[in-house]
Amino acid sequence: MAKIINFNDEARKKLEIGVNTLADAVKVTLGPRGRNVVLEKSYGAPLITNDGVTIAKEIELEDPFENMGAALVKEVAIKSNDVAGDGTTTATILAQAIVKEGLKMLSAGANPIFLKKGIELAAKEAVEVLKDKAKKIESNEEISQVASISAGDEEIGKLIAQAMAKVGETGVITVEEAKSLETTLEIVEGMQFDKGYVSPYMVTDSERMTAELDNPLILLTDKKISSMKELLPLLEQTVQMSKPVLIVADDIEGEALTTLVINKLRGTLNVVAVKAPAFGDRRKAILEDIAILTGGEVISEEKGMKLEEATIEQLGKAKTVKVTKDLTVIVDGGGQQKDISARVNSIKAQIAETTSDYDKEKLQERLAKLSGGVAVIKVGAATEVEMKDKKLRIEDALNATRAAVEEGIVAGGGTILLDIIESMKDFNETDEIAMGIEIVKRALEAPIKQIAENCGLNGGVVLEKVRMSPKGFGFDAKNEKYVNMIESGIIDPAKVTRAAIQNSTSVASLLLTTEVVIANKKEEEKAPMGAGGMMPGMM
């Protein structure tokens, strides 16, 4: 296939157009006065959202060079979402600002390699300053504040704080659609383990890459499954019952996996297979925990059982199961409460007896999963469009809250970024490396300016007023006041800010060192032959 090649400034200019197109679409959502973006879907109603990464993923540009620029910034948003689960809009704005300032300096004759070195030095220092300024979360109120700011809704913030209080900071919190208009919190028996689906073809939601099963049957075995004939008798019965199936096994491979995937794609079988968590004796113990929680049995050859002889009665049950590429969450298992209580007491006795700190830690993990339960936030809304938007906001808020618990909190509203600029050490570097450092310092001003502009105010004026204010003061965009941010509950997770700085500087500095851009040339479609051998256009 023929290629189109662009060089030097022409190449970078095209990339910049792509960067700006994507960033301009995303940055209107920043802050409490941020707007929504409407996304056309191939089926169903349009999606209305203010979630940066969701918007970024939808953007594809016609010009291949511009599309590459957009794709690079899309990577910033996706990476920030993967690391921290929030802060994707801030990361996108920072990347755009670094590219803009960097290209100005390249046009003035700066060396891109030295600029990149300066950007990397400044980013590293900014992250160190951020870590020093982060404050550990100390109260349930602070958890509520982080969640409220991320979701843009105080009620959601309170709900997430309640959920964390019930199941603990590391507990399992899931988000489901409610059948009413109310958004409520429920605590149900449940368990989460760190294994995801064995094949991405098993997902039920291809946009979010998750598999959700309602009222599934759960097959538990410590056996490696490679032949379909072992599963066939059982699966034929589940198909007749029109029940989805979760398979938890030592491994699923070969012919068995291929057949499951083909039948899933054909729609004849709704099945998700995952590997059992942990190893050795601990794996067997966790499988037994899941069996007791779901009211099933572990099909084990050590007990003289054969998979092909397993019956429906030996399968576990649950209200819902959600599987991602890394996690499986079983909610509201069908096990008897007396059996679960007996298992909990047995694990407590083992904890009291063991002398190994490692064994104690692993037993406590199992105990928490069996007794802690799962918090389910049921999202209520008047329409499906509102429901989708609300779910995205709650998921973002959950991610932000977990990030805050992990690495602490900092002043929100872009204030911490100005604080970082003031606190960064002096670098005794050459002029061009110093230019790279200056690029990052200027870029760190961009989020607070954008928050102000989304309020209809002059970003530069707001920036200067914050600079003149006492330490820790910033711009409260919701009430258009200058306040002490942490005291007013306007806080951000340090992890989210860190991910935004690291990912934006990484991708933007690489873009600035680009000298050549190569894209595929589109082949012109040949005109169809005229019917019946006539010349085209003749009737």
Curated annotation (Swiss-Prot):
GO terms for biological process: chaperone cofactor-dependent protein refolding; protein refolding; response to heat. The keyword RNA-binding does not apply. Keywords: ATP-binding, Chaperone, Cytoplasm, Isomerase, Nucleotide-binding. It is an enzyme of class 5 (isomerase). It is found in: Cytoplasm. GO terms for cellular component: GroEL-GroES complex. ATP binds at T29, L30, G31, P32, D86, G87, T88, T89, T90, G413, D492. One of its GO terms (molecular function) is ATP binding. Together with its co-chaperonin GroES, plays an essential role in assisting protein folding. The GroEL-GroES system forms a nano-cage that allows encapsulation of the non-native substrate proteins and provides a physical environment optimized to promote and accelerate protein folding. Forms a cylinder of 14 subunits composed of two heptameric rings stacked back-to-back. Interacts with the co-chaperonin GroES. Belongs to the chaperonin (HSP60) family. This is Chaperonin GroEL. It comes from Fusobacterium nucleatum subsp. nucleatum (strain ATCC 25586 / DSM 15643 / BCRC 10681 / CIP 101130 / JCM 8532 / KCTC 2640 / LMG 13131 / VPI 4355).
